[in-house]
From Swiss-Prot:
One of its GO terms (molecular function) is succinate transmembrane transporter activity. It comes from the Eukaryota. Keywords: Cell membrane, Glycoprotein, Ion transport, Membrane, Sodium, Sodium transport, Symport, Transmembrane, Transmembrane helix, Transport. This is Na(+)/citrate cotransporter. The chain crosses the membrane at residues 13-33, 53-73, 80-100, 124-144, 218-238, 255-275, 315-335, 357-377, 410-430, 443-463, 491-511, 532-552. Glycans are attached at residues 382, 566. Optimum pH is 7.0. Pfam families: Na_sulph_symp.
């Protein structure tokens, strides 16, 4: 039996890779329509994405091959989808994030904020979560987790070592007292209950679990707050521009931030309370002097570890100052471009009729280019005071970024993945597959929109535990957009909750890279992640549902079916 299982596992990739296209052939043979040929490509990509038989980024290139061969789209129409405005926005933000990581500005920000928060365990965990979430808004979730977890580990190791030292000192004092007491007539020696030591070991394990989980959860939650913070948000923006080109910039950096930041903070606080209750319940019995001493020593050592890590960074360098300036400039330009409640700098010279010539992508690429120009060292203009060695060096110092670092650090695969999603959306629209799916979903018009949103959010949250969150949103959003247009509800009322639900990957180590990084440290079992992650999924879906049905309605005007959703751009 074992050998048969091994044999099947060995050839699983081969079978899926070559037999999946063959088994799907009846679809295009029995239904000789363009939308069926498009469905063939999408189903095949979904199978390859979920099974990972070839790299996800390479699967994303299948539309370039199959859409022209099956006469769904011509090659020029497909290829242009891989460098859309949305992809350039994401690429620009990735380059800026690379500069932040290269000069370790994110580490300085993290340690400074943690020192400010304090070292009481509950506050420390909240501090780690807020710092991780904040950094994850601007740089990748994976990079944030990879940077934060070593800090957590170093701090916990020192705290545990301090606890052991305090316990040893306490036991020595007790032993001396008992030796003195034993010399008295009628005295009895009382031995320490081993259950006390066992309980302390369990508390230490729970502390490790809580601190590790809080980082990976905060990374996933924090990325939802900005339009470029995580892949699903970028997919939503791209699908809106592709499926609803007349939506008039309803989805931009400022409008998304106004909606998503409160939701992110709500989810973060709920996650903190849940982890605190599940792993770090305050023990009311611990009110004795020795426990108070241990607690103070633990807090002191945590503060010492954080301060030591911060000291290693040295003073703020010239390069860090310049990166901070570019980063701040990017955020200011994004928010002030077209804030909505007032005219932005876009209205000065870059609007002609209904055409907005400058988008968030323009700003991102501008700052990205700036990073290859701004120097990483202070230029020396006084030639008379330069040493012989300094005169041999070029006058203009090296820039903050160079191409070698950029091509190594930027995750180019996700750019292809996003492009594949936009190509799929274009194929759905052009082939008529979107409209066909919309007609099949017309019976849902009798169901309350809130119930539809809740059910779809649960489906997406379960799916994203098994496959990439970008692939999940890429597959589902065109279907949900067609359904919303068919039954007459605002497309964003369905698309936003499902986009956010794709980031609720809390239950499995393979669900998202931050989970895998934390799991690799060995403090967690799969069952630990499943137990806490299941409740986290429920809390996340509840938070998203509340957000969309309260301030989300005001930000995106979700109560009214928009005119731009009625317009179709389909050539069937």
């Amino acid at each position: 039996m074992a050998s048969a299982k091994t044999y099947v596992t060995k050839f699983k990739s081969f079978v899926i890779l070559f037999f999946a296209p063959i088994l799907l052939l009846p679809l295009i043979i029995l239904v000789p329509d363009k939308f069926a040929r498009c469905a063939y490509v999408i189903i095949l990509m979904a199978i390859y994405w979920c099974t990972d038989v070839i790299p996800v980024a390479i699967t994303s290139l299948l539309p370039v091959l199959l859409f022209p061969l099956l006469k769904v789209l011509d090659s020029k129409q497909v290829c242009v989808q891989y460098m859309t405005d949305t992809n350039m926005l994401f690429l620009g933000s990735l380059i800026v994030a690379t500069a932040v990581e290269r000069w370790e500005l994110h580490k300085r920000i993290a340690l400074r904020m943690l020192l400010f928060v304090g070292t009481k365990p509950s506050r420390l965990m909240l501090g780690f979560m807020f710092v991780t979430a904040f950094l994850s808004m601007w740089i990748s979730n994976t990079a944030t987790t990879a940077m934060m977890i070593p800090i957590v580990e170093a701090m916990l190791e020192q705290m545990v070592a301090t606890n052991v030292a305090v316990d040893a000192s306490q036991r020595t004092m007790e032993l001396l007292d008992k030796n003195k007491a034993s010399e008295l007539p009628g005295s009895q020696v009382v031995f320490e209950d081993p259950s006390v030591q066992k309980q302390e070991d369990e508390e230490t394990k729970n502390m490790y679990k809580a601190m590790n989980l809080c980082v990976c959860y905060a990374a996933s939650i924090g990325g939802t707050a900005t339009l470029t913070g995580t892949g699903p948000n970028v997919v939503l923006l791209g699908q809106m521009q592709e499926l609803f080109p007349d939506s008039k910039d309803v989805m931009n950096f400022a409008s998304w931030f106004a909606f998503a930041l409160p939701n992110m903070l709500l989810m973060l606080v709920m996650a903190w309370l849940w982890l605190l209750c599940f792993y770090m319940r305050p023990n009311l019995k611990k009110t004795c002097i020795c426990c108070g001493r241990k607690k103070k020593d633990t807090e002191k050592i945590a503060s010492k570890v954080l301060y030591e890590e911060y000291r290693k960074l040295g003073p703020l360098s010239y390069a860090e100052c310049n990166v901070l300036f570019c980063f701040g400039l990017l955020i200011i330009l994004w928010f002030s471009r077209d804030p909505g409640f007032m005219p932005g700098w876009l209205s000065i010279a870059w609007i002609e009729g209904n055409t907005k010539h400058v988008t968030d992508a323009t700003v991102a690429i501008f700052v990205a280019i700036l990073l290859f120009i701004v120097p990483s060292q202070k230029p020396k203009f006084n030639f008379s005071r330069q040493t012989e060695e300094e005169r041999k060096t070029p006058f203009y110092p090296p820039p903050l970024l160079n191409w070698k670092v950029t091509q190594e650090k930027v995750p180019w695969g996700i750019v292809l993945l996003l492009g594949g999603g936009f190509a799929m959306a274009k194929g759905c629209e052009t082939s008529g597959l979107s409209e066909w799916m919309a007609r099949q979903m017309e019976p849902l018009s009798s169901v309350r929109p809130a119930i539809i949103t809740l059910i779809l959010s649960c489906i997406v949250a379960m799916t994203t535990e098994c496959t990439s969150n970008v692939a999940t949103t890429t597959l589902f959003l065109p279907i949900f957009a067609s359904m919303a247009r068919s039954i007459g509800i605002h497309p964003l009322y369905v698309m936003i909750p499902c986009t956010l639900s794709a980031s609720l990957a809390f239950m499995l180590p393979v669900a998202t890279p931050p989970n895998a990084i934390v799991f690799a440290y060995g403090h967690l079992k799969v069952i630990d992640m499943v137990k806490t992650g299941l409740v986290m999924n429920i809390l996340g879906i509840a938070s998203v549902f509340l957000s969309v049905n309260t301030w989300g309605r005001a930000v995106f005007n979700l109560d009214k079916f928009p005119d731009w959703a009625n317009l179709t751009h389909i050539n069937t």
